[in-house]
Amino acid sequence: MIPFNRPYLTGREAEYIRQALAAGKLSGNGEFTKRCQNFLEERYGFRKCLLTTSGTDALEMAALLTGVGPGDEVIVPSYTFVSTALAFLRCGARVVFVDSRDDEPNIDATKIESLITPHTKVIVPVHYAGCACDMDAIMEIANRHKLLVVEDAAQAIDSFYMGRDGKRRALGTIGHLGCFSFHETKNIIAGEGGLLTINDERFVRRAEIIWEKGTNRAEFFRGEVNKYGWVDIGSSFLPAESVAAFLWAQLEHLDEIQAERKRLWQNYWEFFSDRTVAASATGADKYCLPRIPDYATNNAHMFYLLFPDLANRSDFIAKMKAQDVSCVFHYLPLHSSEYYRAKHDGRALPNCDRYADTLVRLPLYYGLEPDQDKVLAAVKSALA
């Protein structure tokens, strides 16, 4: 079976973990943590970034930094992973779900403003498949209503946004805060692992304190105070040094990994764009390809197809499985989930529901190249 995902190892992970063990610094914020954070700040222009134990923890740190609580509202897309909403629910805030665009799964910025109330505090755009949301539109709305923006960039490492001002900015640098994931399904991995990016100076000091279990320990180790203690809320968000060592082995090869993933993504694009292939998909089997807006770049996190309905998608997945190729659907709508549907305000979110029924993801990982022709042959057969 050709899997949907296979974690790629560069070959240096075990060596760097051994180095971390030999250094005797295991609990985090050691040499490898600093290397990773410095590399990411310099490469992408984050004002400050902090490694976390997961992308979920990065979101939970961001939620704490926004200061939301009971009575506050946070606008979140329904077509996303549960962590996007959970982080704010755990603070006591109410999540207000917004629909996706009709031409791509990202948040529909034109639907945000009508959902803003005096209780709204935060907007959380999710860059689906590593493709940028319309950040100029979102930031304009946020600035007009004095709201915070937290970018959920879990899938968006090494992806960029071209603003109306002509500036090219890394995703995760545009909102007040940004969150990334290094889960094993992502482009760059650490098993688990995540990253919080802080782009607003107001949040830098408090982010370090929350990261260090509510203490000013980071200031103590920089020699800024002569002792450290409990000064705020926080938790154990700092990952072990072994996680940072693993991540550093990946970051050293970031350009190589990205180049390979983009080659594989482009192979898919050219195959499905070919008129002969498109002509073989008849009637209800017709598909749509991913849309990359002019303001977005493609980081090759995911290649997906959109089928006309659930039945045709299910048929395609079954036919691919019969040929030993694993293709998978993605999110179930959060607004109609078992946990939240009674709390939702009842608004229909038709685009979100459509993507939940029709989107299918194809295998895409470093090392797929020897098997990609088999995947494409299976696709041709499944669409015949």
Residues covered by each model-derived region:
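PLP-dependent aminotransferase-like
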Residues: 64-160
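Short beta-strand-to-turn element immediately C-terminal to the catalytic PLP-Schiff-base lysine
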Residues: 180-181, 194-199, 248
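PLP-dependent aminotransferase class I/II
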Residues: 34-38, 43-47, 110, 122-126, ...
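Phosphate-binding glycine-rich loop
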Residues: 26-73, 86-91, 97-98, 164
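Conserved active-site segment immediately N-terminal to the catalytic lysine
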Residues: 151-189, 219-220, 226-231
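Structural detector of well-ordered beta-strand residues that form the stable sheet scaffold
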Residues: 50, 75, 96, 149-150, ...
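N-terminal "arm"/small-domain region of PLP-dependent enzymes with the aminotransferase-like
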Residues: 1-27, 229-231, 363
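A short alpha/beta connector and helix-capping loop motif
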Residues: 106-113, 164-177, 370-383
